[in-house]
From Swiss-Prot:
Keywords: Cytoplasm, Lipid biosynthesis, Lipid metabolism, Phospholipid biosynthesis, Phospholipid metabolism, Transferase. This is Phosphate acyltransferase. The gene is plsX. Pathway: Lipid metabolism; phospholipid metabolism. One of its GO terms (molecular function) is phosphate:acyl-[acyl carrier protein] acyltransferase activity. Belongs to the PlsX family. It holds the Pfam family FA_synthesis. Homodimer. Probably interacts with PlsY. It comes from Mycoplasma genitalium (strain ATCC 33530 / DSM 19775 / NCTC 10195 / G37) (Mycoplasmoides genitalium).
């Protein structure tokens, strides 16, 4: 099937060319796909000749990082709103943006609606671990507050995603908390714990502490968006700090760097968040993906790749069908 991607090329920290170049590169390996680039005249300057499967759509404004959901709704011709509308109206299958997270979560929720009355939208990212694996982590910033039942439904949706997109038939689910004891956390942790534990269709491990995340003990980690975002950014910052420390050390001792360069490059590539960028917006009736506000070409590529995987697995319909059993 010729999937159609709507890509918002404005409203993030880098130049629009980072998004455009990522699209061109990914399309060069997947020429059956269609891409719609949404930007302004300046973004498309010099981009006169494009492959027939890649088209441009002009916007007269963009969502700034200082915009609120309320102010963003007034920008009806912003690049983000146009991209979202393409999916809402059936003219694209997925929307991708690096714009404001709060605005994107709000506008996609308005346009697409909940996939189930019990769901709340959540950004689901993926994080590499030290056992040559990774885990899917949600919510990492779409919504600060969740009820226990809403966290439970995050687990249900992520479980479906992993089963559809990987070979894992019984993915291990963990619930982020400050300790592993069953009495830890707030009331919503307790409620979510009971629901997850009672569901015999889920492989629920229990509470998981953040210090064990990179050990690869779970395939799915559930958290409210506030906690999830803090943990994700702390990990990204830690990886960058370690890289700087190693770089300074090798400058002082080049010989040590020479002998360990291969290992260091392998580890750096694995844990570089640019290679693991992109978050699926779970809980909606249509497919949307979010990438970093500082996204570069590599991060857009990672996000497009994840979007393509989600489309090929027919993710939205799979979640809808499965959650029909949870209408109570």
């Amino acid at each position: 099937m010729a999937f159609r991607f709507a890509v918002d090329c404005l409203g993030f920290e880098n130049k629009p060319s980072e998004a455009i170049e990522a699209v061109l590169k990914y399309w060069s390996f997947h020429q059956d796909l269609n891409f719609i680039l949404i930007g302004d005249e300046k973004a498309f300057d010099g981009l006169d000749i494009l492959p027939k499967n890649i088209t441009k759509k002009l916007a007269n404004s963009f969502i700034e990082m200082t915009d609120t959901p309320l102010s963003a709704r007034r920008k009806v011709n912003s690049s983000m709103q146009i991209a979202i509308n393409l999916v809402r109206e059936g003219n694209a299958d997925v929307v991708i943006s690096a714009g404001s997270s709060a605005v994107y979560a709000s506008l996609t929720n308005d346009a697409f609606g909940k996939i189930n009355k019990n769901t709340k939208s959540a950004f689901m990212s993926y994080v590499p671990t030290d056992n040559n694996n990774w885990f899917y982590f949600l919510d990492v910033g779409a919504n600060k507050y969740f009820t226990g039942k809403e966290l439970y439904f995050l687990g249900l949706m992520a479980d479906i995603f992993v089963k559809k997109t990987t070979t894992k038939k019984t993915p291990k689910i963990g619930l982020l908390n400050i300790g592993t004891e069953e009495n830890k956390g707030f009331d919503y942790h307790q409620e979510a714990f009971k629901l997850l534990k009672a569901d015999k269709n889920l492989n629920f491990l229990g509470f998981v502490e953040s210090r064990f995340l990179l050990d690869g003990i779970c395939d799915i980690l559930i958290a409210d968006g506030y906690s999830g975002n803090l943990v994700l950014k702390a990990m990204e910052g830690t990886f960058k700090t370690i890289a700087r420390i190693l770089k300074r050390g090798y400058k002082r001792n080049p010989l040590a760097g020479l002998f360990s360069l291969g290992i260091i490059k392998s580890v750096a590539k694995k844990f570089d968040y640019k290679n693991n960028a992109g978050a699926v917006v779970m809980g909606l009736n249509k497919l949307a993906l979010k990438t970093h506000g500082s996204a570069d070409k590599q991060q857009f590529l990672s996000t497009i790749r994840l979007a393509h995987l989600s489309l090929k697995s027919d993710l939205i319909n799979a979640i809808k069908t499965s959650l029909n059993n949870y209408e109570e």
